[in-house]
Amino acid sequence: DENFNFSGQGSDKYSQQFDGNIKFKCFPNWPSEVSEKSEYVSLYPNVMLGIHIDHFYAFWLEPISNNQTKEHFELYYIGDESASSDEFKGIREKNFAFWQEVMNEDVTAIEGMQNGRNSPAYNGGNFSPVMDTPTLMFHKWVATNLTK
C-alpha cells in the first residue's frame, strides 16, 4: 500500500545471546512459541528498528552531504538489570559486537553500489522480486512524496 511509510521483514532464526549462564531478560508477554522470531521494520526515509525477545534496536541514517552519511545505532534492553548492571556488562558488549559485525557486513556492498551510481554506465540496478520488496516499497514512497 503506497500510503504506508514503512516496510520490513522478519526472521524465524533469532537465537538469544548467552554469556556463561547469563542471558538477557525477555519481554514478559512475548509468547514462548515465537521466541526465535524477530522483526526488522524500516520507517521511511531513514530509520530501521529491530525487535527480538530480549532486546531491540534503533538504527538511523543522517545524511551529511551528497556522498556522506552518518550512521547512528542504539540498543535497548528489557529491565534495568539487563540494561545497566555490571553482571550483564559482558553480554551487552558481546551483543553490541554481534550487531556491529552484522551491520558492517553490508558496508562494502553499499559503498560499492553508491560508487557505481556515479558511473555513466549505471542502469539503475536490478532488483529481486523476492528479496527487494522493501526497496521497491521505499522507491514508491519516494516517488509518491516527490510528486506531492
Regions found by a protein language model. Give the residues of each.
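C-terminal catalytic domain of Rieske-type non-heme iron oxygenases
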Residues: D1-K148
